[in-house]
Amino acid sequence: NPLYSTDETISNGFSHNAAENKTYYQLKLDYQREFDRHNVSAMVLFNRSSRAYDNRVEYRYQGISGRATYAYDNKYLTEFNIGYNGSENFAPGNRYGVFPAGSIGWVISREAFMKGTEKWLDNLKLRASFGLVGSDKISDNNDDRFAYLQFFQGGDGYSFGFNEFGSGYDGLKEGNFANPNLTWEKARKTNVGFDATLFNGKLTIAADYFREHRYDIITTLSDGDKMGYPDIVGKDAPFVNSGIVDNQGIDFELGWNSTIGKDFRYYIKPNFTFARNKIKFMNEVDYGNEYRQKTGRRLGEHFVYVVDHFVYDQAEADKLNAMNDGRGFQPWGELHPGDVVYKDLNQDGKIDDYGDRTHMGFPRTPEIQFGIPFGIQYKGFDVSVMFQGSLNSSILLNGAAVWDFPSYEQDQYGKVKHMHLNRWTEATKDVATYPRLTYGAYENNKNGNSSLFLYNANYIRLKNLEVGYSLPKNIIRFAGLQNVRFYVQGFKLTNIRQF
């Protein structure tokens, strides 16, 4: 073999083929009838699905659902749904869940006592819905499937001999603990709202109030500060149904579509959503410090050290480094002038993970989201614009986004960030908002998991802009064309934010 300068046969090759097969069965029965002012309908649906990917065990689901509706005079509306769904993720006996839901509606604008409003009120509908929904998602990790089964997995750390290629024969070890009682995560949802159309369709209004009570949340007690197993057990705690989270908020949309004269048309349709959640129960460790607890707080709040000040001079640095019998006030190395000093929240004379971190800022997911689409049209010209933004959100920056002179990000070598411009120096020590710049030694006191790098993530951006022109009909009709439009479109053209 001249390519490899050897006459030996090259073996031990590797090949891999993968295929995905999906199978879906559905049986559906529908019924619908109208008589006098009554309208009734019903539906029964059975479905079963399976998905096989590569050499994994098939994913399988099946269920039966039903729906019944009744309307009287297109004025009083009702609907009832029920689902009986089964998932492979749970043990027999816990595999199926029953999930009912219902809704009612009242088209109040059709009532006799609303007579006289039709001159300005086109439609007014009040509505409400309620229901129970379920989730069988355990995690995004395929290895977490069948969490109700105890299994064995390949061992590590010791080999029982070696094969001819030098690979060891590993043993087996018991996998993570199973939970045969694991079942569906559930959420009770309620929604009330109204829809209105006024002035011959020019003005539209839609408003909703929603509330969700989520319970039996599928989680593992090994996450964070939850009540898991001690290390001596040697295994992670199993997945369990534990946790309660409430969420509530409002949706609002307002639209106006009208004309000025014969040729000028315009529209605007702003929308707004506010949602806030609260952890009602979480099986977490009680450290005796309320500021550490997640129960009673919002999901996604940042758990950080709190910056107190920067070391003012060498005398202060020496004093802090001498604390705790020379081990120092903070565990990340010697402090120097300009370094960050964190707040001792539990007042034990030192900074540590268990007592000196707390929840700060807004959650990662915005609580407020809004959009402002609008546009105009004049003869053949048209312009459409979409602004979009969010409020009540915080982000914890890390890595190359904030650290001094990062050498591990290919496009960030030595780049100075805007927050570095207000760094600590002897001349700026009284007004600095960022610690001294360092590289190499003594840089660890800028802990990335701290309020120093917690930023307001509010933003508004010009998400979409489109400008177009349509050729006059009397020009293109000779070519047998119905419409010819030229346009220029841009996405994410500008962004206003703090960082």
Where on the chain are the PLM-derived regions?
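Conserved active-site-proximal loop/helix segments of enzymes involved in bacterial cell-wall
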Residues: 219-223, 351-353, 401-403
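Glycine-rich, aromatic-lined ligand/substrate-binding cores of catalytic
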Residues: 363-398
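Residues embedded in well-ordered regular secondary structure
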Residues: 10-21, 25, 31, 55, ...
